[in-house]
Amino acid sequence: MEIIRVQNDSDCQICDEFLEKLIKFEAGCDSLILENVKVKDIHKNSLKHDNVYIAYVTDKSPIGYIFAYLKNPKGKINSKNVIVLEALFVEEHYRRKGVGKMLMKSLENWAKECFEKDFVVEITSINKNENAFGFYKHLGYNEVKTILRK
């Protein structure tokens, strides 16, 4: 398996397709999310900004991807740089085989290169997605906020 950092339009299209799959899955857990969203150029447009990390894993073909960005730099409000994990998706056949962990490790390594130890990664996980919640907890992430909706 190989991690490829997104650099061109072709890479971005692969990630757009993964994001559509993730959105479709999350729509089954959260009624606010529309199921048939078509993603176009989200990753391509994101690459224009500094401090964005987009990568995917291949095993002869793409099997998973990750998308994160610097939301709040250290300074005025935060004591550390806040990186938001926007999306993590692994094809079902490859889940529980270390692919997600590999992608998260690649994100953390990128963050260390950019910010040394002066960062946190924030993740929003849908409550009904217990597998994802357990996965992040297993990697050492802890609950710090709860979003309430009416």
Predicted regions and their residues:
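Conserved beta-strand-loop-alpha-helix junction that forms the acyl-donor binding cleft
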Residues: R95, S106, K117-A132, R149-K150
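Conserved active-site alpha-helix within GNAT-family acetyltransferase domains
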Residues: K101, E113, S125-T146
